[in-house]
Regions:
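Membrane-anchoring alpha-helices and their flanking helix-loop junctions
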Residues: 2-108, 120-180
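Extended, alpha-helix-rich binding/interface surfaces that flank or overlap catalytic cores
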Residues: 116
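Solvent-exposed interhelical
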Residues: 111
Length: 180
């Protein structure tokens, strides 16, 4: 576990000069909300539907003996991480929605291990579903989900958090990895 020594209840403070200079959008836009559309949950649901449709129309089975137990373990672990992350966000009284403005910088719970525990759990859920169902299509869809989540959500969320929390967020980024 990474020891993150940052004010656990950091309130928005402003922007760093470096972030303001690098950003391609006005800082006020970043400060209000990271994005207009809640991409990550939509991407997850779309990937599940695509995996089921592809598995039905073009079956490509996973047949190794431990696939189902491994898939179940990934799903349970992913759900537990999701619940833990959402509980940490709720405890800090900030939003769980990726398109809403964050009122607090959450650095405890699963956020002390990774800056994006919910998105990691989404990937785990997709991989677990593929293994549990014996459907190979979920594996490339999990990778696609992670890449699209990065480009459509994470980059903007990072700008939003930096615009709102400045040096505290930069210190958090130095202490905790984006993924794992």
């Amino acid at each position: 576990m990474t020891d993150v020594r940052i004010d656990q209840t950091a309130q928005p403070t402003g922007t760093s000069y470096r972030q303001a200079r690098r950003s391609g959008m006005p800082m006020n836009a970043c400060k209000k909300r990271p994005t207009i559309f809640p991409w990550p949950p939509v991407l997850l649901v779309t990937a599940v539907i695509a995996g089921l449709v592809l598995g039905h129309n073009a079956p490509y089975e996973i047949t190794f003996p431990m696939a189902r137990p491994s898939g179940l373990a990934l799903i349970v672990t992913g759900l537990l991480i999701d619940i833990w992350a959402m509980a940490a966000l709720r405890k800090a009284r900030t939003t769980i929605w990726p398109n809403r403005s964050s009122s607090h910088l959450v650095v405890n719970g699963p956020f002390s291990y990774t800056r994006n525990p919910i998105y990691i759990s989404n990937v785990m859920l997709l991989l677990g579903a593929g293994l549990l169902l014996g459907n190979f299509w979920f594996i490339p869809l999990a990778v696609i989900d992670a890449v699209l989540t990065y480009f459509l959500a994470i980059r903007r969320e990072e700008k939003h958090l930096n615009a709102n929390f400045g040096y505290k967020y930069e210190a958090y980024c130095r202490a905790v990895r984006r993924w794992i």
